[in-house]
């Protein structure tokens, strides 16, 4: 099968970007690329293997200034529309090679970044509505960039806290202990972990106050969510690791319960064998469920997306950028180091941790999708073209691995719009506006083209064709997690589900029973890979406490003398993850 025609997929994208960059929000900061430069960058991107992280981002904007002493400074915005990630290139006149630094804008809605001082003393210019800051972190006897790099922190502050230097750190368990020791040795415990990290290491510049937003009545939302389509509704002893409102005597299967001290978050529990015969007996959609799967507990969490923003970060190691071992033959080009022509994101840095500027708003985190080695096809048509369809991903407006048509995709746009769908060629026109995206396999549930009802995807019953993978001993039924999008009366809900053991068929039937419009697989095989935690709002608590969907997930967090430091928010991790922030 031939490769997808890249130019056809991106027709009109240059014009789309030109209109987007002309918006008033980009009146300051680096000048957008000219039409000529944009066309050159797009041509580079449209090759089968762009070959570098810069070539993968055709909407990037660059600015270069030169000092009177020969110092050359270049600033690259990977996506001016999103205004979050920058690469700083510094080359002294007598240097053997330039130095590169990955910078992150701590508040993209406020700060616009550019360079000044051309022909004199170069500096970074950081402009806000009523403020401007000039800084040259490469200058002086003890350059701020060197000091920030020596901290060993995943995010080190620069320029009075307006920028972060993203540092390379390890996401291993050994490094978690090292970070915990660093915290113990350098901090007097007695504040919350949020203040510990933000106040002591990142200074008060990162503390933010959020106005309260109008919250829907929990009872009304529970009523709107309704009950799952089950044949029976027994009260179950099983329950998630959250404190729930009204569940003191147990949880009724298929019903929703508000999570205590976590507005906008709800939980449910069931077993696939309880699903109504109306769904289970529909022929030709899924495989039959065996007795083990029918009686296995499923724990679900629903997020009212009117109250949350969704984000995504890569881990320090996963997903990686080289080839999966799965594609072969026509699905693999041995002449290039990875499916996009590179096997490293350098000079960008993936650090597996939530930005400290977002800690006071974080409501939940959960692990992302497959590692790169599992995230491509070994069998079926998808294995034979488009380099085996390695799952794509995009962070902070920066495309890190190409998004392929036909793959299940979670995405967020620049205006906060959240979606979950099968990616299409036409959707590539959204690329300049994408803030986050993650692909993982194919649809478990997608809308029926005639009725709009959520029905199992075409490849749910195909083990190889759907790239569903399995347990260590190649069993299709194993511990799995998935997510779904459901819309109720114009209100979007993101559902995350933990299946103690399930096949794709059992997952699809469960999401059908809960009325999902679209659903996709996340990760599988261990509680570490299916980790999910909430962070309730408790005013008098001096820690950021994590409550886990399943109690065993707490073992992944880092223990300290004052309590557990949660994964993804308190230390770097080697796996990618999603996070939900309370809207400001």
Named regions from a protein language model:
Residues 431, 444-445, 455-458, 468-584:
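Extended C-terminal subregions enriched in glycine
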Residues 12-22:
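Bacterial N-terminal signal peptides
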Residues 2-14:
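Bacterial N-terminal signal peptides that target proteins for export
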Residues 314, 319-500, 504-512:
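Aspartyl protease catalytic domain
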């Amino acid at each position: 099968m031939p490769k997808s025609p890249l130019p056809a997929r991106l027709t009109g994208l240059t014009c789309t970007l030109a209109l987007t960059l002309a918006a008033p929000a980009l009146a300051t900061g680096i000048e957008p690329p000219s039409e000529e430069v944009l066309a050159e960058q797009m041509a580079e991107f449209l090759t089968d293997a762009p070959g570098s992280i810069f070539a993968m981002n055709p909407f990037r904007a660059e600015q270069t200034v030169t000092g009177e002493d020969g110092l050359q400074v270049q600033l690259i915005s990977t996506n001016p529309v999103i205004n979050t990630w920058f690469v700083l290139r510094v080359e002294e006149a007598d240097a053997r090679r330039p130095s590169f630094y990955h910078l992150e804008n701590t508040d993209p809605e406020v700060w616009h970044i550019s360079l000044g001082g051309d022909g004199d003393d170069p500096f970074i210019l950081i402009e806000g509505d009523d403020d401007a800051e000039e800084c040259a972190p490469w200058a002086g006897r003890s350059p701020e960039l060197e000091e920030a790099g020596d901290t060993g922190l995943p995010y080190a502050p620069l320029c009075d806290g307006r920028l972060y230097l993203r540092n390379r750190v390890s996401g291993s368990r050994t490094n978690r202990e090292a970070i915990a020791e660093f915290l113990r040795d350098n901090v007097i415990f007695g504040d919350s972990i949020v203040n510990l990290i933000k106040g002591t290491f990142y200074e008060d510049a990162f503390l933010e106050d959020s106005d309260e937003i109008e919250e829907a009545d929990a009872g009304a939302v529970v009523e709107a969510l309704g009950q799952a389509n089950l044949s029976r509704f027994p009260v179950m002893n099983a329950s998630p690791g959250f404190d729930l409102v009204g569940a003191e005597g147990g949880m009724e299967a298929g019903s929703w319960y508000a999570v205590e001290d976590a507005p906008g978050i709800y939980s449910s529990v069931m077993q696939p064998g309880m699903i109504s015969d109306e769904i289970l007996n529909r022929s030709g959609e899924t495989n039959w469920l065996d007795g083990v799967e029918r009686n296995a507990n499923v724990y679900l969490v629903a997020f009212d997306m009117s109250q949350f923003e969704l984000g995504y970060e890569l881990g320090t190691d996963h997903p990686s950028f080289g080839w999966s071992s799965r594609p072969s033959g026509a699905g693999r080009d041995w002449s290039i180091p990875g499916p996009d022509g590179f096997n490293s994101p350098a000079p960008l840095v993936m650090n597996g941790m939530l930005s400290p500027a977002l800690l006071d708003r974080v409501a939940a985190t959960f692990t992302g999708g497959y590692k790169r080695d599992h995230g491509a096809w070994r069998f079926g048509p998808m294995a034979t073209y488009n380099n085996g369809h390695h799952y794509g991903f995009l962070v902070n407006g920066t495309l890190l691995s190409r998004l392929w048509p036909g793959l299940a995709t979670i995405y967020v746009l620049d205006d906060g719009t959240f979606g979950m769908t099968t990616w299409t060629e036409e959707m590539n026109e959204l690329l300049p506006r994408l803030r986050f995206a993650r692909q993982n396999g194919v649809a478990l549930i997608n809308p029926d083209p005639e009725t709009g009802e959520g029905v199992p995807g075409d490849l749910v019953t195909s083990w190889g064709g759907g790239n569903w993978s399995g347990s260590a001993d190649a069993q299709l039924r194993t511990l799995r997690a998935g997510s779904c999008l459901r819309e109720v009366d114009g209100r979007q809900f993101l559902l995350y589900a933990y299946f103690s053991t399930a096949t794709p068929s059992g997952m699809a039937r469960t999401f059908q029973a809960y009325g999902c419009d679209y659903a996709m697989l996340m990760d599988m095989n261990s509680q570490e890979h299916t980790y999910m935690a909430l962070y309730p709002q408790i005013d008098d608590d001096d820690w950021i406490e994590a409550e886990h969907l399943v109690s065993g997930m707490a073992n992944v967090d880092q223990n300290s003398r004052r309590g557990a430091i949660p994964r993804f928010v308190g230390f770097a991790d080697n796996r990618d993850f999603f996070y939900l922030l309370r809207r400001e």
